[in-house]
């Protein structure tokens, strides 16, 4: 997603398709005032302060064994500086704004139980996608999916859908997650149509 936003110094790659799993598009335009204000103040007054998500009571996956392993992994970042979070939000701003430029074949996946990226930013991102050609776009909504869709307990279902889309993008997904995606993703009056329905 970084390369596709144009924010990277890396040239935008010539790719056959783009797969976005729970895309990080929670940019400032979709945030409430309080988080935006807290980030603005924090990056100016305490940019080096580190924060953890321990007290947030957010569950990124239903795969508890995997989450416990990540908690013990020394290679996983467990505390993040405020200035790093600020940079991440800048990147999410760019990602949210990049939807209108994504004319590659696209597969967007999102879990109904995602507690990291709210549904509204995903809806806004999907709503900005080019209206045509809709046949090159597939949206998938996983009723039992969390943020870490590929590592969730039903991750094999998601992986099978990814494999199906890579091999035959126009075919319906084996899980059927594309059949309910339209109602879950799109706003009333959206110009975007959903392929595979």
Residue ranges of model-derived segments:
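Alpha/beta-hydrolase-fold enzymes
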Residues: 1-81
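Active-site nucleophile elbow and catalytic-triad environment of alpha/beta-hydrolase enzymes
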Residues: 80-98
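Catalytic active-site module of serine/aspartate enzymes centered on a nucleophile-bearing elbow/loop
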Residues: 136-197
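Short, conserved loop/helix-junction motifs that constitute active-site signature segments
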Residues: 12-13, 99-103, 129-133
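Hydrophobic/aromatic beta-strand patches that form the interior of the parallel beta-sheet core
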Residues: 19, 107-109, 140
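Short alpha-helix in the alpha/beta-hydrolase fold that links the catalytic acid
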Residues: 104, 118-128, 155
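Short beta-strand/loop motif that positions the catalytic acidic residue
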Residues: 102, 108-110, 114
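Acidic catalytic loop of the alpha/beta-hydrolase fold
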Residues: 78, 113-117, 125, 148
């Amino acid at each position: 997603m970084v390369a596709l936003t144009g924010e990277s110094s890396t040239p935008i790659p010539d790719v056959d398709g783009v797969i976005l799993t729970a895309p990080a598009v929670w940019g400032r335009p979709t945030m409430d005032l309080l988080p935006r204000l807290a980030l603005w103040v924090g990056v100016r007054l305490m940019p080096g302060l580190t924060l953890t998500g321990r007290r947030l009571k957010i569950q990124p996956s239903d795969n508890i064994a995997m989450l416990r392993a990540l908690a013990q992994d020394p290679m996983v970042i467990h505390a993040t500086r405020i200035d790093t979070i600020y940079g991440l939000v800048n990147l999410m701003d760019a990602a949210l704004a990049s939807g209108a430029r994504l004319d590659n074949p696209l597969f967007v996946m999102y879990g109904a139980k995602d507690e990291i990226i709210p549904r509204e930013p995903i809806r806004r991102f999907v709503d900005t996608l080019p209206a045509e050609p809709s046949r090159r776009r597939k949206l998938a909504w996983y009723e039992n999916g969390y943020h870490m869709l590929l590592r969730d307990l039903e991750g094999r279902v998601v992986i099978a859908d990814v494999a199906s889309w890579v091999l035959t993008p126009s075919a319906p997904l084996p899980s059927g997650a594309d059949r309910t995606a339209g109602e879950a993703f799109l706003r009333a009056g959206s110009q975007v149509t959903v392929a595979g329905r």
